Swiss-Prot record:
Keywords in alphabetical order: Coiled coil, DNA-binding, Nucleus, Transcription, Transcription regulation
Ligase recorded as keyword: no
Protein's name according to its UniProt entry: Transcription factor TCP6
UniProt feature, compositional bias: Basic and acidic residues: 22-35
A GO term for molecular function: DNA-binding transcription factor activity
Domain of life: Eukaryota
Organism of origin: Arabidopsis thaliana
Gene for this chain: TCP6
Any single GO BP term: regulation of DNA-templated transcription
Domain TCP residue range list: 68-122
Length: 243
């Protein structure tokens, strides 16, 4: 049994709530609550979808940041990247266009090939690539060590005053080509000057090991020169005594 609210007779009719009006108010409140729930649910679902999208985006960026596999051939000593000064990089880019190369790597290879003489003069040994990139035949280890030994010998002889400079005078003012007598020409005769004795060459039997025959050959050549001048001295003395 539903109890109806008592109506106040003193109040006007429009202020006294009827049952129909109460039912309408109840339905309207229920609709508002349902509408609020729907709006809240949609917002919550939208937020969840946004969070899922953010997670997917983060995973995609992490996969994108992974280093790509190196598709080039593996070469000993090869780094993934070479940092160049800005001017050098710009010049290499310009040379690549001027020379018609396909990449900057070809230009660098071309520069190394043409700079090989300067590299040899600066480092003696030069560069040693893993594969042949120089069109000319590379120098052997024997020739490289011969070159270094020759330079060391020349430096020592200059310090001792036994090597003539370009003007024809020796270092330190000591000239073996003048003032000795016996018709002795000094340094060039014993193979230390500009005219080397034929056949007297420095050879290497192994890398970094001198051939003992070289010293024997040098001793024989020096003995032959000294014996030749001694024989001429004896002939000159005999002629002076005979006269």
């Amino acid at each position: 049994m539903v109890m109806e609210p008592k109506k106040n007779q003193n109040l006007p009719s429009f202020l006294n709530p009827s049952r129909q009006n109460q039912d309408n108010d109840k339905k309207r409140k229920q609709t508002e609550v349902k509408g609020f729930d729907i709006v809240v649910g949609e917002k919550r679902k939208k937020k969840e979808n946004e969070e899922e999208d953010q997670e997917i985006q983060i995973l995609y960026e992490k996969e994108k940041k992974k280093p790509n596999k190196d598709r080039h051939l593996k070469v000993e000593g090869r780094g993934r990247r070479v940092r160049l000064p800005p001017l050098c990089a710009a010049r290499i880019y310009q040379l690549t266009k001027e020379l018609g190369h396909k990449s900057d790597g070809e230009t660098l290879e071309w520069l190394l090939q043409h700079a090989e003489p300067s590299i040899l003069s600066a480092t003696v040994n030069g560069i040693k690539p893993t594969e042949s990139v120089v069109s000319q035949p590379p120098l052997t280890a024997d020739l490289m060590i011969c070159h270094s030994v020759e330079e060391a010998s020349r430096t020592q002889m200059e310090a001792n005053g036994l090597w003539r400079n370009e003007t024809g005078q020796t270092i330190g003012g000591f000239d073996l080509n003048y003032g000795i007598g016996f018709d002795f020409n000094g340094v060039p005769e014993i193979g230390f000057g500009d005219n080397q004795t034929p056949g007297l060459e420095l050879r290497l039997s192994q890398v970094g090991v001198l051939n003992p025959q070289v010293f024997q050959q040098m001793g024989k050549e020096q003995f032959r020169v000294l014996h030749h001048h001694s024989h001429e001295d004896q002939q000159q003395s005999a002629e002076e005594n005979g006269s």
